[in-house]
Regions:
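Feature for intrinsically disordered/low-complexity regulatory segments and propeptides
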Residues: 1-49, 53
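Intrinsic disorder/low-complexity polar-acidic segments
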Residues: 40, 44, 48-264
């Protein structure tokens, strides 16, 4: 606190300091202190732009994905829209163009959807960004992964960012949505073909001991059998991640599942 006070008083002119305050019943609360080059992007502006381009999340192609493939009423319990005093995440899946996955479970086909998610922080804890994911309707898992032509977009909060963030984000989303389903099916089939000889050792190289145990338990619960292949491991990882409360931590784990598909 002393260092912060000294820096604010000595290192910068008061005109260069941006302060974000939130008014409440108990008075004003300091949410963020930023420098002159910082360009704040409001969460409300992002959600408004997404609604304008992609719909309201319940009626367009990109929607809050329904549980187990059913069109359900979006509630606080099943929503894929998250916000806190630090950051925001919006997950939307292309519900109208689902991908049929052969032999998803017990010889039965399943469905997946391509989706995208946007994250932002009004207080400067992270960049504004977008990445793509696959939504598995069998178990409501998310795999943070996309086709090769889609790259994750990260935009720093600078003074000019409000004028350009949407122009960089929208083409990536449209490219992913308009891509063929064959690349998704092939990636899954390739991952299924790679067998894991020692699952415990394989997971231990990537996760802690407790996480590895939880991943194996999640796959056993969801699929009714132990992990045997790279695809099984990805499914177990996302099953474990599904129970992580904070979205930034959950996404970090879901990215690991996507890395397995890339490695297949």
């Amino acid at each position: 606190a002393d260092c912060l006070n000294f820096g604010l008083q000595v290192s910068r002119d008061i005109e260069d300091v941006g302060i974000l305050l939130t008014a409440g019943d108990d008075g004003a609360e300091l949410r963020a202190v930023t420098g002159p080059a910082y360009g704040r992007i409001w969460n409300s502006d992002i959600t408004g732009a997404l609604v304008q381009r992609f719909g309201d999340g319940v009626s367009g192609d990109f929607r809050v994905p329904g549980e187990f493939g059913k069109a359900v009423t979006v509630s606080k319990e099943n929503t894929t829209l998250y916000a806190s005093d630090r950051d925001m995440f919006v997950f939307l899946a292309d519900e109208q163009n689902r991908i049929e996955i052969p032999n998803r479970r017990d010889g039965q086909p399943g469905q997946m959807a391509r989706g995208f998610f946007v994250w932002n922080s009004e207080v400067g804890s992270s960049t504004l960004g977008i990445s793509t994911f696959l939504f598995d309707y069998v178990c409501s898992n998310r795999i943070v992964w996309g086709a090769e032509q889609v790259k994750e977009v990260r935009i720093r909060h600078t003074a000019s960012v409000n004028d350009r963030w949407l122009e960089e984000v929208v083409p990536a989303i449209q490219s992913y949505a308009n891509g063929t389903a064959s690349s998704v099916v092939k990636a899954i089939e390739d991952a299924r073909s790679v067998r894991i000889d020692n699952v415990s050792e394989f997971l231990a190289k990537r996760f802690s001991r407790s996480q590895s145990s939880a991943i194996m338990a999640a796959h056993l619960t969801d699929e009714g059998r132990p992990i045997e292949t790279l695809w099984d491991a990805a499914t177990g990882i996302t099953g474990y991640a599904r129970n992580i409360a904070h979205q930034d931590a959950r996404v970090a784990i879901e990215r690991e599942a996507g890395k397995l598909l890339e490695a297949a």
